[in-house]
Amino acid sequence: MVKRILGLDPGLATLGFGSITVQPDESLQVLDFGVIKTAAGEEIGSRLLTIYEDLHTLLQHFQPDLVAIEKFFFYRMSNTILVAQARGVILLVLAQHHLALMEFTPAQVKQTLTGHGNADKQEVQLAVQRELKLESLPRPDDAADALALALTASFQR
């Protein structure tokens, strides 16, 4: 049975997504990846609504069996609050769709994909490119991170 996994890299300004399938023979295929962007000048409520609506659309389009998301941890205080608000909207939408969720810390993703938990961003992106047989490094970074989360989930099942 084909399994669809959607990786999400939470953010208020840019939310990365990456959708992959795991085939019955365990081979991996990229369906799509990209970002949901919100305008910095908009009020926070409007930005969260954009995430809410666009994420519903993504879920209807990809129909994932599982969603992988970065586990929340603290950044700078102002950024932490904004990411937490966006993450709350993401969790709400996932609950509305009754989707299974796996959470990973950045160190878990790095360890799974590169073999060491202190890998830099380029090492992770090269691992994503290699595992998914992409012609070039996935861009932008938020989408690459989302693909890395989806890949990590595929290896953990």
Curated annotation (Swiss-Prot):
GO terms for cellular component: cytoplasm; Holliday junction resolvase complex. Its cofactor is Mg(2+). Keywords: Cytoplasm, DNA damage, DNA recombination, DNA repair, DNA-binding, Endonuclease, Hydrolase, Magnesium, Metal-binding, Nuclease. Binds 2 Mg(2+) ion per subunit. It comes from the Bacteria. InterPro entries: RNaseH-like_sf, RNaseH_sf, X-over_junc_endoDNase_Mg_BS, X-over_junc_endoDNase_RuvC. Mg(2+) 1 binds at residues 9, 142. The active site is at residues 9, 70, 142. One of its GO terms (molecular function) is crossover junction DNA endonuclease activity. Mg(2+) 2 binds at residue 70. Belongs to the RuvC family. PANTHER family: CROSSOVER JUNCTION ENDODEOXYRIBONUCLEASE RUVC (PTHR30194:SF3). This is Crossover junction endodeoxyribonuclease RuvC. It comes from Cyanothece sp. (strain PCC 7425 / ATCC 29141). The lineage of its organism: Bacteria, Bacillati, Cyanobacteriota, Cyanophyceae, Gomontiellales. The gene is ruvC.
